[in-house]
Amino acid sequence: MDKFKTIEGINSMNSVDDQTGQANRLATFEDVHGLKSSDFEVFLQNIAPFSNSEGKPYVILDGMGGYGDVTAHILAEAKKSNNVPEMYIADESVNQLQRGVTSGTLPEDFAKDHLVVTDIRETPFSNNLFDTVVIKMGIHEVPLQEQAKILKEVFRILKQGGKFVTWELAFSNKESQKIFQDILRKKDEIAGFTQLVSNRWFPTEEIRQSFEKAGFVDVDSPHTLEPTVNLRKRESELSSVERTKLMQKNGAITVEENDSLIKLGKQRCDELVVFTKQYMTSVTSDIKQAMNYRETEDNVIFEPEKKIFVGYKR
């Protein structure tokens, strides 16, 4: 396989993505979305198999893979049957890729030259390279007009007969989509994720048509997931920009600094809860019910719609 720009030899402290919101987010997907282990089991079932009928390992790309959580789950599942695929992780954030190594999310023996620094909309990979491409909750991170580029690029780098599996938001109505988008944009604004505020666009069920326009066939959404968004679970994320800057400056965080960051995260979460409660006063009861929206004295909880989509390149 050709050489790509990987995390080896890159000084993440000086990389351009330190100024973007995505690179500074230090929250785990599982924490902020209240996922169950069964959700990932279903996801893995749709990604499988990990080799062909002759036992040759598949080449799988974890696109927009961040710190490698999906890859770690795939490898753990595949090792149960001694059926380990060749994994690559692609992400434009050097920080996120390096976090996969330093946090222990990825196995110690994971090849560093398989951590590829690239924008998923225009990758360095050759045509027809991967047996499977996976993207978990990544498509919504780019503007609406750019999302089609992701699907077209995935189609290009997939082998004939290859499979694309994505776990993504898929709102059944535009009202719920707008509510979720407005609340998450406010969260990003409070946290200082300036790039995410302007870039994010959360899909509706129309994403199925986008798959087909890109060339995918037999597009299906075999599973609907019901994760829980608990705003209080966002406290650490809301102070992660400051936490990252302190780590970059000093290499460590003191007890006093950590206490201040915890306090800052709580204060910002208080602000987000107040905003959300006020925002939801104008939302109809049927939409609230569809979102399973509920409030407590200091928290807001709701359940966005997410689905697993599968499409094939024939």
Feature roles, as predicted:
Residues 3-44:
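Class I SAM-dependent methyltransferase Rossmann-like catalytic core
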Residues 33-57, 73:
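Conserved alpha-helix/loop element of class I SAM-dependent methyltransferases that forms part
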Residues 61-122:
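Class I SAM-dependent methyltransferase SAM/SAH-binding core
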Residues 121-133:
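A short acidic, Gly/Pro-enriched loop at the edge of an enzyme's catalytic core
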Residues 148-160:
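A short glycine-rich, Lys/Arg-flanked "PGG" loop and its adjoining helix->strand segment in the class I
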Residues 165-188:
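Conserved class I S-adenosyl-L-methionine
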Residues 199-214:
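Short alpha-helix
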Residues 220-314:
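Conserved Class I S-adenosyl-L-methionine
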